[in-house]
């Protein structure tokens, strides 16, 4: 069934796909509400995370994205706000055992995470081990029912058909978003990848653009081509760029 759905999606892509914006524009509030203010650096300190959370509160970002060891701290810093705590699972390689990813996700939610960004098993995807990839994602989704799960497909390592397959499997497995990149690979988000991903998953799922998004113009372009969320460590700079352009 999985293979059939992938083949069907590839055939539709070859016949009907057209690269064009999905919306005409995006304003500063659209950008703010899409940003997941991110610090996944291996040398991030508790003070860095406190600053990240303060900036997210002040700018009314959607959320912060932090490494698992900082979920509790971020939860405390954001208490009483609408800012979501997002963390990562199987990060950054995606090569953990499936049960390890599931347990990581459970521990993260117990610590206060609202959303989980898990890394797909890239090697298994490239080997066309579709059932493995499906179960890998499904196990995380099932382990944290009621929480948002995003699947990082690491587009820089995939060809077009593999990107389509990753999106199809993520959707079948019950994930809520697909995400372009870890930020630790050889490339980040592109408008072309974001648009393709949105075209495949449709309105039933979201798309998170992440990796290399550093300016207001970058963020607007991603949203115009289908991104629902923006993962970036440059959230404040992006907002400042929008305010300089439009006033604020």
UniProtKB/Swiss-Prot annotation:
Superkingdom assignment: Bacteria
pH profile of the protein: Optimum pH is 6.5 for 2-deoxy-D-ribose 5-phosphate cleavage.
Localization, UniProt: Cytoplasm
Main location: cytoplasm
GO cellular component terms, semicolon-separated: cytoplasm
Gene Ontology molecular function: any one: deoxyribose-phosphate aldolase activity
Record Gene3D superfamilies: Aldolase class I
EC main group: lyase
Function: Catalyzes a reversible aldol reaction between acetaldehyde and D-glyceraldehyde 3-phosphate to generate 2-deoxy-D-ribose 5-phosphate.
Family in the record: Belongs to the DeoC/FbaB aldolase family. DeoC type 1 subfamily.
Protein name in the entry: Deoxyribose-phosphate aldolase
Phylogenetic placement of the source organism: Bacteria, Thermotogati, Thermotogota, Thermotogae, Thermotogales
